């Protein structure tokens, strides 16, 4: 890792690779536990767990595996809290394009104001390229970007991944519109889920991670 946090905060449940990455540098991992009675959504009380000892936070929006979203207003308060303590906030937005209104949640417009924020994005999810590892980070902090580059492996993006990325960008708007049309058809799946009494486990924001 480009940053070696001593103490970090992750949600539980969350994508397991966050904790794994933190473990490689011996960081103490603390958990903000998502509760079923709150629909597994992040609440205001997460701010109380961000202290001067918190070096890094990982948040995923929409969350993996619950699919629940966090409103931008709360994320801004989290960013302000992190800014106060010099905490690095890593926002994973790899699934955000699957949301009906992604612009309502994405935070790239705040990067200049909050240089301690790093946004993670990926081609893998939205362009259906499983197994092709192609992702990127957005960050306004030049010093942090330099440290991240220094930690990259040589040839960290394969030629195959590069070609796939270029091909995806050629007609990306049309592809995203097709994805949007498919997304809007999810009501059929919702109705079937209700018939099977699955509505409780599927009553989530983006409904991406059930299968």
Predicted regions, residues:
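Phosphate-binding glycine-rich loop
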Residues: 1-8
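PLP-dependent aminotransferase class I/II
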Residues: 19, 116-202
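Active-site pre-lysine segment of PLP-dependent enzymes
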Residues: 23, 41-53, 65-89, 93-126
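Short Gly/Ser/Thr- and Asp/Glu-enriched loop/turn motifs at secondary-structure junctions
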Residues: 203-209
